[in-house]
Each structure stands twice: as structure tokens, then as C-alpha cells.
Swiss-Prot record:
Keyword list, A-Z: Chromosome, Nucleus, Telomere
Subcellular location: Nucleus; Chromosome, Telomere
Role noted for this protein: Component of the telomerase complex involved in telomere replication. Stimulates RNA/DNA heteroduplex unwinding which favors the telomere replication by the telomerase.
Name of the featured protein: Telomere replication protein EST3
Domain of life: Eukaryota
Family affiliation: Belongs to the EST3 family.
Listed InterPro entries: TPP1/Est3
Gene Ontology MF terms in the entry: DNA/RNA helicase activity; GTPase activity; telomeric DNA binding
Gene3D superfamilies registered for this protein in UniProt: 2.40.50.960
Gene (name only): EST3
Entry keyword annotation includes Ion transport: no
GO BP terms, alphabetized: telomere maintenance via telomerase
One cellular component term from this protein's GO annotations in UniProt: chromosome, telomeric region
Source organism (scientific name): Eremothecium gossypii (strain ATCC 10895 / CBS 109.51 / FGSC 9923 / NRRL Y-1056)
Amino acid sequence: MPKVVLASRAHKADSIFLREWLVDAVVPALERSGACAPWAGVECFIPALPPATATLSLEPTVIQNPKRFLRIVRFTRVHDFAVCAVARDAGCCILVEFTPHCVSNFERRYHQRITSSTVNSLFVIGNTSLLFYARSDAAAAFEVPALMNGSSTLPVLRVGDCAIFDQDQVESHRRFPLVQEHPRFVQSLDMAMQGSVLSRYT
């Protein structure tokens, strides 16, 4: 008799630490940036990680903050020692740039490339800025041509520090939209752009 795999056990469940937070954090940041400059961003969007220790997974400041967690979906480009990727929370994806400093520290800590066997792994991040890229700049920087067909402004996380929280490579067959495709982001960006146009005539 063929072996039957129950649907509930066909795929590993996602981590309980990975929650939906990107939209709730990015949209208010866009709204606060002002009508005249919706691309201003937030320099200290996520604070630095505590000093690396063997008990990082037990650090309260890490596990109690949902904004610390992202799962790597894919890497898109390595350029000038910076590594570009797409990562996600439990609901949406976002473009991520790991700085050269971040990449160097990661590779010294784990003795491996940041791109080696880490796709679908759960990362914790810190020292992270939120940037807003123009569509053409994002498509070029991340080498994702499909970005040219979407929003005129794209949120990007520039990560200055990261660590592996769980290296189990949990792959989901669900489609996770990019943050800029979410209705709340689209609405907030439209309002910001309308305010920018009006401000030129007042």
C-alpha cells in the first residue's frame, strides 16, 4: 500500500516567532515621512542586536520583538560586497540589502557565505534602516526586472547586522506579495504623492 502523507504534515509549519509585521511597520513610516518626501525613510528602523552569544535565541530583546524576524526567500544579487535578497514575514515579502559590514560579520561568525544554505532560513536582524527606492533604482539594484511593472516607490530594508535564528529551511508554497502590493501601502503612497503634488502649489 502506498504511503499516505497527511496534508497537515506534508510541510513543516512556519516558526511561531515569524509573524506579520512588515505592513504594520512600513506603512506608518511612509505616512510619517511627510507628503513632500515619501522616500525619506527611517535610519534607525530596527535597533542593533545584542552582542552575539550562544544563547541568542533566548535573548528577551530578540524573541519578544516580531520586527527582528525575517525568512530569506531568495538572494538576487551580490555587488560591491553587499548582498541583495527578498525576505518575508508571515504575510508579505520585502527587498533586503545586507551591507558589506553585515556580510563580513556574518561570514566570520558562521564560517560560511551568507548565501550558502540559508535560503528559507529564519534570520534575526538589527541595525536596520528603512529606505524608499524609486522603481527603476530598485529594479537595477536588485536585478529583479518584474519590479518595473509595479509600484513607483518600493520599501527596502538595509540590514547592518543579522544572525541565524533557525537554519531549518522551511519552504512555503504560498505566494507572499511584496509590501508595496499591499492595499494599505498603495493607499498611503497615493495619499503621500497627492500631498506632494499639492504642496508644490501652496
